[in-house]
Amino acid sequence: MYIPSARTAIVQDDKGGLKIDRNAPMPQPRPNELLVQVKAVAINPCDHKMYERFPTPGAVDGCDFAGIVVQLGSDVKTFQIGDRVCGAVHGSNPSRPESGTFAEYTVSDGEFTLKLPPNLSFREAMGLGTTGLSTIGMAIYKGLMLPGSPLEPAEKPRTVLVHGASSSVGTMALQLIRLMGHIPIATCSPRNFELVKKYGAEEVFDYNDPECGQQIKQYTGNTLAYIIDPFTDVKSVALCYEAMGRAGGRYACLEMYPEFALERRSIKVFFALGMALLGHSLDLAYGYERDEDPEMRSFGIGWYKVLQELLYQGKLRPHPLRELEGGFEGILKGVQMVKNKEVSGQKLVVSLE
């Protein structure tokens, strides 16, 4: 199969933003990696946060992708050229600037790449939010330490609060928690109540209501012990801690937490950083840095095997999509829309076919 020597990609510029590079270098897959021709991408908050927090001119942005395998690393045994796949990588990575997904081609670790079933299109696969699936797996098992598996549900259900559940991360968390045999409850804006219930929430609360925390506490009988918080700002931490039961519990956040989050000793805080699931060291800062972690990598490989089986069984329903036209120009527009908080209850997807 012909592979060009260069590709079009969206890279960081030297002014703290993004630009389209029509002559970006073609990445070479390492022994355990795949080279994928990208057919669709999804846009995540991390796609603007990475270049804002960790400026690296020339680094390719983007984390989620779906496409076709065009080249195999020397150690890859479980994929073939032509396989339809999806996955997530560390975009705008200072340690590997060529690795983002907003490009005609990207590289992906074979252990963290999912094969698409025939009935799932590239666009629909992006509704799964593969970056979010990585993060939620870490939050559920390493942060909340919930028993059970989506393939072998727990015998005794726990109630789990998913704060801000109308995002793709939220709807995937709701489904996975249900599959594990637990009871998800949720917060979101009232306009998304029905959406969140369709994805498995037992009860939903308005996170803009000043009494939201107390309402959750009353609903759970002051016994709530498990919370996932994608926002992790001062307001969300305060709400989640108000909702937490008298005895405390486990709080898994998806952003770096403010210092006061550690003041309530009965609450165990865990920062679930999805890009750390691969077990590689992260040359970042501000609490996002990580040492190499073979145990986390082993866990991540096992989690992706579970996700692959769930895909084959058709047990994960993609988040509602909003497709943007314009290819790479559409991606730039979408990143700005997410940055400006113009998206609610939908996953922005751009086709590159």
Curated annotation (Swiss-Prot):
CDD domains: enoyl_reductase_like. NADP(+) binds at C46, D47, H48, K49, S189, P190, R191, N192, Y207, L254, E255, V343, S344. SUPFAM superfamilies: GroES-like, NAD(P)-binding Rossmann-fold domains. Substrate binds at T131, G132, L133, S134, T135, I136, G137, M138, G274, M275, A276, L277, L278. Induction: Expressed exclusively during fungal penetration of host leaves, the time point at which plant defense reactions are triggered. It is an enzyme of class 1 (oxidoreductase). Its EC number is 1.-.-.-. It holds the Pfam family ADH_zinc_N. Keywords: NADP, Nucleotide-binding, Oxidoreductase. Pathway: Secondary metabolite biosynthesis. One of its GO terms (molecular function) is oxidoreductase activity, acting on NAD(P)H. Disruption phenotype: Does not impeair avirulence in Pi33 resistant rice cultivars. Signal peptide: none annotated. Belongs to the zinc-containing alcohol dehydrogenase family. Trans-enoyl reductase; part of the gene cluster that mediates the biosynthesis of a tyrosine-derived cytochalasan acting as a fungal signal recognized by resistant rice plants and leads to avirulence in Pi33 resistant rice cultivars. The first step in the pathway is catalyzed by the hybrid PKS-NRPS ACE1, assisted by the enoyl reductase RAP1, that are responsible for fusion of the tyrosine precursor and the polyketide backbone. Monomer. This is Trans-enoyl reductase RAP2. It comes from Pyricularia oryzae (strain 70-15 / ATCC MYA-4617 / FGSC 8958) (Rice blast fungus).
